[in-house]
Amino acid sequence: MDLIPSFSLETWVLLALSLVLLYQYATYSHGFFKKLGIPGPKPLPLFGNVLSYRKGIWNFDIECHKKYGNMWGLYDGPRPVLSITEPDMIKAVLVKECYSVFTNRRSIFPAGFMKKALSISKDEEWKRIRTQLSQNFTSGKLKEMFPIIKQYGDVLVKNLRQEAEKGKPVQLKEIFGAYSMDIIIATAFGVNVDSLNNPHDPFVSKASKLFRFDFLSPFLLSVVIFPFLTQLYEMLNISIFPRDSLNFFTKFVKRTKENHLESNEKQRVNFLQMMLKSQNFKDTESHKALSDVEILAQSIFFIVAGYETTSSTLCFIMYSLATHPDVQKKLQQEIDKTLPNKAFPTYDVMMEMEYLDMVVNETLRLYPVTNRIERMSKKDFEINGMSFPKGTGVMIPSFALHRDSKYWPEPDEFRPERFSKKNKENIDPYIYMPFGNGPRNCIGMRMALMNLKLALIRLLQNFSFYTCKETQIPLRLGSQVILQPAKPIILKVVSRDETIRGA
């Protein structure tokens, strides 16, 4: 049997030419950094360096930082991405040249109307949306929302107590994920849910689908390898966000607006109501109200951006406290002294608790939810005396910087004292960036810290956390783009009432 197909000469020539053209496409940009004398990992045809992310972007960035120093080049498919780690360079990108050159984040996936979301929007559209939304994240607005969040602090304690009373170790992500989801839906949409006990609630089920991304899936890889497919997918109305979830929230926002226009009753404060209310003010050249589509995009993105920030960080904090019982005890002492008899904190008191702040900051140093900060240049630019063309991506490997021994003695150790008042002054704000930096930093930073700190206070007022045989020590991190443990964190949870009775 002839194993080689009997094609005509013309067919063989066409096939050979196609392979040559494919190879040229697959490698045409891969000499970009070599010409500039910038080191970096060798890219593969078509894929660039993305297959190296299989062990985790955080791991890849640490290895590159150790091997190549303060600057290196990599390729996401054919796209060149410059990695920088020097504080002066980082400041130039995130602050000094934010509006002129590095206004926009890298966004390569088809997003449909979600392109209007704050995190994805670009240039003047982003500036206008950011200005509109900033007034909803002031400390005054967060104080208005604090009673809602307090309510879910009690639900969190109740749910965890029910699990702890079973006498078995507790998988934390399910409990903390429910707390995060409940708060997001309540503060974004004004809807009360109990996602742990009602997982089939449509709000819960539709919201849960929004952050189920696999960035190494064939669909998303196709966009990385063939960037032109993004436009094709957009034309075909194909998005990385699940259509049924988008349709559900579209209908809800439309119905909420209709009720908002018809009702004069005072509504419970939530971000959707605040955005709808802002449409009542007269537009000016510098103050144009959000459109209905823009409001919808922000509402949905609150879910995407907020869920992992709270739930995963809470898991990492409790793991760190369980493996460092001296730190846990010291934090409980601060909480008990500041809030005797399990008193509920006020917003201001909570934000002034020094050791609580130290513990949260050190956890965010070790486990920043996002591994990287990325920008896309909209003009030609210079860094370190070298010229780069418009469209070059710039990446800051925040996880690698948070674990850099140049800035952090014994960087893999959990030491809240790094963030004491005395030591905090020595921390470079362009090295420690759990929420980014500059005009395009995370707008929800205060909200995230409020949710984290309230949960921590209520948890440690009521429980102590211990390692058990199911606890993975040392903790291994997963390969997801958003930082998570490789395996769920499981701890023994003991009511402090029992501890006191048994003392």
UniProtKB/Swiss-Prot annotation:
InterPro entries reported in the protein's UniProt record: Cyt_P450, Cyt_P450_CS, Cyt_P450_E_CYP3A, Cyt_P450_E_grp-II, Cyt_P450_sf, Cytochrome_P450_3A
Keywords associated with the record: Endoplasmic reticulum, Heme, Iron, Membrane, Metal-binding, Microsome, Monooxygenase, Oxidoreductase
Keyword Cytoplasm: no
CDD domains for this protein: CYP3A
Record field: catalytic activity: an organic molecule + reduced [NADPH--hemoprotein reductase] + O2 = an alcohol + oxidized [NADPH--hemoprotein reductase] + H2O + H(+)
Primary localization class, coarse: endoplasmic reticulum
Disulfide cysteine pairs (residue numbers): none
Any matching Pfam family: p450
Cofactor(s) recorded in Swiss-Prot or TrEMBL: heme
Triggers of expression: P450 can be induced to high levels in liver and other tissues by various foreign compounds, including drugs, pesticides, and carcinogens.
GO MF: heme binding; iron ion binding; oxidoreductase activity, acting on paired donors, with incorporation or reduction of molecular oxygen, reduced flavin or flavoprotein as one donor, and incorporation of one atom of oxygen; testosterone 6-beta-hydroxylase activity
Broad enzyme group: oxidoreductase
Role played: Cytochromes P450 are a group of heme-thiolate monooxygenases. In liver microsomes, this enzyme is involved in an NADPH-dependent electron transport pathway. It oxidizes a variety of structurally unrelated compounds, including steroids, fatty acids, and xenobiotics.
Family: Belongs to the cytochrome P450 family.
Protein name: Cytochrome P450 3A17
UniProt organism field: Cavia porcellus
Top-level taxonomy: Eukaryota, Metazoa, Chordata, Craniata, Vertebrata
